[in-house]
Amino acid sequence: MESKCEIRKLGFMVAMEIEAEPLIRHFSLEKSTVHGFDVYENDDICLIISEVGIINSTLATYILIHDLKCRKIINYGVAGFTNESYRHCSVFSVGRVFKRDVDFTALGCEPYRFPDKPSYIQLETDSRLPICDCYTSDEYIGPKSNVPKDVLVDMEAYCVAAVCEKYDIPCLIYKSISDITANENTQEQIDTYLKSAVDAICDYIIDKVLNKAPVCQGE
C-alpha cells in the first residue's frame, strides 16, 4: 500500500517502533508503506520509522522530504547521555549535531569535521527546554568510549539534520535520556529506562509541540 500523504504535512522521523507507538495511538494514525518504510499519517502529520542506524535515518528523512513533501521535519527519540549531570528521562532540544565517527585530523581538520564543512550543523531550538549537543554514529557508546562530556549520543540526529539542510527544510530535534553512557547498566535497567524515556519524550511532543507551536530560536 502506498502512502496518500498530502503535500506540506509536518514530518516526524523516529528510529524505533516503540518511539512511534504513543503518537500512532494518540492521533489514530493510519499505516502505509513507502519504499519499504512504515509510514503512519493523518490529515496533518506523517510519521516514518527508519529503524536504527545512520543509513536508515538518512533514507527515511529523504523520503519525508522528497516523496511525502513534508514542510518541516521533527526527529524525536531516546538517546544516551555522557554524564550524570541530568537524570534519566530528561528531555532536550538539540542545538548542534556532530558526526562522531568523522576523523580527518590527519589532514589538519578539527575532530568531527569533514574537510569542506563545519564540524557541526546548527539547528533551530525550542527555548522551553534545555539545549544540548548531540553526537551521532553507528557505534554503541559505553563507559570506555571516547566522547565529550555532557552531550547526547544517538544514531540518527546528524543524518536527519544533514538531509534537511541539503534541501532547505526546517528541522527540530528532541531527545530524552534513556541511559547514562558512563554507567554499566543491566538489560533490565536498559528496558525500564527506555520505556520511561519514550513516555517522557512523547508526552512532550504531544502536549507541547503538537498542541502548541514551539518557541523556536535560530530560524
Label the model's feature ranges:
Residues K4-G11, I45:
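Extreme N-terminal starter segment of soluble prokaryotic enzymes
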Residues K9-T33:
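N-terminal beta1-alpha1 ligand-phosphate binding loop
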Residues M1-C5, E219:
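Basic/polar N-terminal segments that are highly enriched at the extreme N-terminus
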Residues M1, M13-M16, M155:
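Detector for methionine-enriched segments
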